Amino acid sequence: MTTETRSLYSQLPAIDRLLRDSSFLSLRDTYGHTRVVELLRQMLDEAREVIRDSQTLPAWCENWAQEVDARLTKEAQSALRPVINLTGTVLHTNLGRALQAEAAVEAVTKAMRSPVTLEYDLDDAGRGHRDRALAQLLCRITGAEDACIVNNNAAAVLLMLAATASGKEVVVSRGELVEIGGAFRIPDVMRQAGCTLHEVGTTNRTHANDYRQAVNENTALLMKVHTSNYSIQGFTKAIDEAELVALGKELDVPVVTDLGSGSLVDLSQYGLPKEPMPQELIAAGVSLVSFSGDKLLGGPQAGIIVGKKEMIARLQSHPLKRALRADKMTLAALEATLRLYLHPEALSEKLPTLRLLTRSAEVIQIQAQRLQAPLAAHYGAEFAVQVMPCLSQIGSGSLPVDRLPSAALTFTPHDGRGSHLESLAARWRELPVPVIGRIYDGRLWLDLRCLEDEQRFLEMLLK
């Protein structure tokens, strides 16, 4: 060991001496004595390794307390961090899908802080059913006879099939054998539920007679699956639920539908593309309809099944129902969200998902122009900051081919180097409230459709 190396080792402080420093008192109060000591030992090992490998001290050795504070602050951050979603995808699966209405947030907070009547009947002090209050709301909104709630729509489809068709055949059009994110495939779900898939028709064309010829003594269900995350166009043919229900009645086979996104309002009244609604399918006579709570409905993650009372009863009594049931926070948020639908005139204001989807391109354009000047002043030395038209998407497999006119702030490096865009995007992801955009066509795009808190946005980007 050289004299220089010995000198560097001698400059490493003892842990006891560091802990006596006043700057470590608050760190010990905040993070605990044990964790601070563990980290200091780790940092001393790191420093010795740096000395051994490069004959120098780490830069942070000049201020141990500052480095400990920085590391422990980062360590204490929640894995679920709030972000500013400027990707242009409103219902972004990786960012948690639907934002919750204030009424839902308040309802969840109350449910978390107090015992609630989850399965308790106040009228007779007996055991109640956790789905009852929501079932009444859903029946009022959709016209169904009864309803069942589980933890997501994949679970809803699994329960629907397992409870009504296990050991039997389910007839589905070949063009509706969907796969959604996470490799959720209808054929796989059927196998898991104990059903036999009987696919009919071709990828692009399925006729009523295809279903008719497939039905036999072992057929349990005729199933429709809404292709919410892709579209087959051109020379196509599919029969709708009403026609399939008529065929099912003739053959004495019930019809069920996996609707996927499941909007409870006609989106076309807001200038958005129309999506099938559960109440339309119930009116057509479909026995069971499943859909998501956290997509177009704008609530928490949940799987909702509405339909005929005797069919719902089979779901409620199936052993899988307990394994898949929703917890009290989910039910509280979903109930509060559904109550907003009882006042449709205020829905676009109080439901964040609908509010963001219905923002006009003109309003977003004005917002972008308002924000351009301060951002150009801050980033102008390295990037050209411009306002550009763009197209948002709904996301989460909802209306996959439809786009919403929007406006974006774009950042283009003066030197044209893509690495500068990657570096800028990485810097923004490290902010206290990360700002998430997307890199496309030599620019970093910030689609402002989902930006409602301009002040927080500027505070982050002008740091």
From Swiss-Prot:
InterPro entries xref list: PyrdxlP-dep_Trfase, PyrdxlP-dep_Trfase_major, SelA-like, SelA_trans, SelA_trans_N_dom
Subcellular localization(s) per the UniProt record: Cytoplasm
Transferase found in the keyword field: yes
Reaction it catalyzes: L-seryl-tRNA(Sec) + selenophosphate + H(+) = L-selenocysteinyl-tRNA(Sec) + phosphate
Pathway: Aminoacyl-tRNA biosynthesis; selenocysteinyl-tRNA(Sec) biosynthesis; selenocysteinyl-tRNA(Sec) from L-seryl-tRNA(Sec) (bacterial route): step 1/1
Keyword annotations: Cytoplasm, Protein biosynthesis, Pyridoxal phosphate, Selenium, Transferase
GO MF assignments: L-seryl-tRNA(Sec) selenium transferase activity
EC number annotated for this UniProt entry: 2.9.1.1
Cross-referenced SUPFAM superfamilies: PLP-dependent transferases (SSF53383)
GO biological process: conversion of seryl-tRNAsec to selenocys-tRNAsec; selenocysteine incorporation
Cellular component annotations (GO), alphabetically ordered: cytoplasm
Required cofactor names: pyridoxal 5'-phosphate
EC top class, as a word: transferase
A Pfam family matched in the record: SelA
Sites of N6-(pyridoxal phosphate)lysine modification: 295
Family to which this protein belongs: Belongs to the SelA family.
PANTHER family documented for this protein: L-SERYL-TRNA(SEC) SELENIUM TRANSFERASE
Subunit structure: Homodecamer; pentamer of dimers. Binds only one seryl-tRNA(Sec) per dimer.
Cited function: Converts seryl-tRNA(Sec) to selenocysteinyl-tRNA(Sec) required for selenoprotein biosynthesis.
Name by which UniProt lists this protein: L-seryl-tRNA(Sec) selenium transferase
Originating species: Escherichia coli O1:K1 / APEC
Primary gene name: selA
